[in-house]
Amino acid sequence: MASTDRSFDGSKVGTRLRSAREDRGISLRELARRVGVSPSLVSQIELDRVNPSVSTLYALVIELGMTMSDVFGDGPATQLIRARSDDDSLVARAETRRVINLASGVRWERLTPHSDPDVEFLHVMYPIGAESCPEDALVTHGGREYGYVMGGTLGVRVGFDEYELGPGSSIAFDSSSPHRLWTIGDQPAHAVWVVIGRAADPRAVSTAR
């Protein structure tokens, strides 16, 4: 497994979400109502005391008009400038990947060296028993997803269909279809995951609970 980026504090995800909410003049209770979770959960996430689930994070990002680059903590404009001048701008080193830790131990490592508004290129890790969201709270958003499982076994539900993906298996689907990921068996799972055009429909509905 890759190392955590020591220059990036993933625990500040909640701080970034709170700043975005306050900048937009949305109350904590109103944001919670829109997302469909309790105000106390939003408060705990903003204080970095609780990691959001994948579905809740997506719902918050959508409601706040953010991008995943905002969540990872960098801006596309400055990163594009750096990409033109940095000799190492094309490479994301294992020890300097940006990381987001989510509920139930799910972990995202960004595989692009800098932010890209059109593509989310991730190494996703699911410990034993982990899930992207509860069974009754599937997530939807704009874009299209592609996944390739490298280790362990992932369950993937898309709409009413469920798939079991072991090492070497891959999947592609429209992200607007309700979907969910979880670990199957007694081994952690990890995969390369790509989302293209998630921000294409910023008002896509997430069914987070």
Where do the protein language model's features map onto the residues?
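DNA major-groove recognition helix of helix-turn-helix/homeodomain DNA-binding modules
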Residues: 36, 55-70, 76
